Amino acid sequence: MVSIGSRVTIQEADFDPETYHLVGATEADPRNGRISHESPIGHALMDKKVGQIAEAETPGGKIKFKIISIE
């Protein structure tokens, strides 16, 4: 289950997988793969499990992605 401190690999349809480290707001550094649990993607990931689909409303529009792995 995704929580703060998890390293999560997600994949949107037709895109390569991306890995993010979910951190607290003060530790966020999106350019280095560290996203806040309060960000749209981070919030959508919280409490999800491998194989689940999550949706997030981002500045670029709504995205849907599958959780590939959680470490």
Which residue stretches match the model-derived regions?
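Non-DNA-binding regulatory cores of transcription-related proteins
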Residues: 1-66
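Short, compositionally biased
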Residues: 67-71
